[in-house]
Amino acid sequence: MTVEYLTEQHKKGRQLIFDLDDTIYVETQFLFKVYKEIAQTAINVNPNLIYNFLKKTFIDDGRKDLFNKLKSSFPSESFSLDKSLSIMRNYKCDHCIETLPWFRKLLSNMSSEFVIKIITNGTPQQQYNKIKSIKLSWPEELIEVVYASSYAAKPKVLSFYQLKGVEKFISPIYVGDSLTDEQFCKKLNIEFYDIKKIL
């Protein structure tokens, strides 16, 4: 399956719906900018040490307890979990993050009326800020985002039914990258397109 497949299916009247993180863009592009901001709050330690710690810990262990690990690894700093989370949830840049090449290619195949439909998990404010930070190069009124966590996070299906005109959808395709996305599609009985196949 390729971008051409998605283009062809859309021409047949099927709706394309997308996950956000690591589907449309690489999430670490955003996260590492946030980590740099958090590192800049350091007073007693070189911010580059903090930044490199956050990056390495995320790559090695994921995001679980990341800021608690930061606090315990740099006891001379007065890192506040609340302050770090606040930076995390409120950071945005002005269209500073590129979409993945496959997504740009897909959009170049679409008509000017194509609506980018996104269903994304995560803290709604942070996901909103990510959308604002991504260079989608598409009219804002043609971007529809459902913040699943405002209803029930994927793989629960409630978020799907928040899309405009969902009752008229014909055999939609959900484009994602994770087991959660795949389970979401199974519960909805819709096609899951694993983007990792073309990345």
Residue ranges and their predicted role:
Residues 1-51:
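Active-site neighborhood of HAD-like aspartate-dependent phosphohydrolases
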Residues 123-173, 179-183:
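Substrate-recognition "cap/lid" segment bordering the active-site pocket of phosphatases
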